[in-house]
Amino acid sequence: VKNNAEFENVGQWKRAWYYSRDNENMHQSVQRESKAARDSAGILDASTLGKIDIKGSDATEFLNRVYTNAWSKLSIGKCRYGLMLNEDGMVYDDGVTTRIDENHYLMTTTTGGAANVLSKLEDYLQTEWPELDVWLTSVTDHYATASICGPNSKKILKKLFSDIEFNDQNFPHMSFKNAKIGGIDCRIMRISFTGEHSYEINIEAKYGNSLWEKCMDAGKDFNITPYGTE
């Protein structure tokens, strides 16, 4: 709101659509935001994405069944994009799922599809595969997420997390690291939805505003620009 966001209704959320400046129309705002993210750095509030915590000794097998791609060889600390289909073969939802531990995953879904995906997964567990040892918990509103993208995103992350090496060897694409910011636990995922070098920072929801302000402060020398989903 403080950054003059225009919102759209998505599922149960109001999500920043674009940020207008100086009487811009939507097209002009989107062009400015896109150019900033391409030339230097942009920041997106990705908190509205659905998040489902998946635990249990059969969690990997469960993912193998609900996604079109395989999950058995995904290493701990890695992320993978997954595509979920309906029983008629049509796309139902998609998102990135992260392997936190041997029997622990964090699935992300589309904002509007989060409740329906959770319901479908619970239905599968209760009616189709009751023998599987899997527990699902909706954690969408437990975490706030700031996504920083652009050619200067790595420099901004380095200012926020000076103890982490953000080179490709130590922090490759589609991986995550646990970290602390201001003494608060958080999780950094190197995931890109823009085609640019990007990182997502997940933190307990009550610290979301503080995280955003820290990111904006760290990125001010790089003209970090809030951008919406449009």
What are these regions (language model features)?
Residues V1-E230:
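Glycine/proline-enriched, intrinsically flexible loops and inter-domain linkers
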